[in-house]
Amino acid sequence: FHAVMADERTIRFIIASGEKLSVSEEYDNDIVNKFEVRKLIHKVVFDNSNKDIVETLRLIELLSTHNYILQTMLHRIELAIAVEIKYCSLTKYSPTFLEKPFELTINNEKITCKELESGKVIEKQLGSTYNIPNIKFVGFIDRVDTLGQNIVVIDYKSSQTDFSLESLELGFISQILTYSLACEMLFNKKTEDILGIFYREIARIGK
C-alpha cells in the first residue's frame, strides 16, 4: 500500500485528478471509473522496481488463490486513490512526500533533527538547560500534505486497536507529536502552521 501510494506517478495523478473533480458527492467507484484509476495502478504495480512491490507480487504468485488476492488488493488501492482524489479536491491539500526517515535527538539544551536521506541537520535551542539524559527518536514520517504555508502530518494506522483518544491524552501515543516537531524543524515552520492528524485504518480500506 505505502509503496504504491508513495510512487511519484500516483502522487501526480492524485493532484491532477483532484484539480479536475468538481462534484464532491461523487461515489468512490464513480471516481475510479471517471479517471480510469485501474490503468494507473497497473502501471505503478507492474512497471516498478520498488523492492516492496516486487516482493509482494512474488509472494502472492505462490498462493493458490493468487488471482483473487491480487484483484482484491488492486481494488482496495483503487478505492484508496479515489478517496485521496476527493480529499485533494475538497481540501486543496496536496500530498508532498511519503515515508521520510528522520532522527530526532533531545538533550539538556537543544533539539537536533536529522533528515536521514539527505543528511541535513537542524538544531533548535531550548532556551533553558534541563537535567535530562539524551533522548533519541528514529522513525518515518508516513506522509506530509501541503497547502501554502500550512502542512498536515499524517500517521497511517493499521488497526482499530492501536489508537484511541484516551491513549493520546494520557501520553501513551507520541508518534504524531514527534513527527510534527520533526516537520517543524525540517521545513522551518511555526507550530501553528502544522496540523497533526491520524489517518484512516489502511487495513480496512475497501471493506
Task: Indicate where each model-derived feature is located.
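A non-catalytic, helix-rich entry segment at domain boundaries
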Residues: 3-118, 125
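Short conserved aromatic/hydrophobic patches within beta-strands of well-structured domains
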Residues: 1-2, 77, 143, 179
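Mg2+/Mn2+-dependent nuclease catalytic core
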Residues: 110-207
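Short alpha-helical scaffolding segments that buttress acidic/His motifs in well-ordered protein cores
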Residues: 1-4, 197
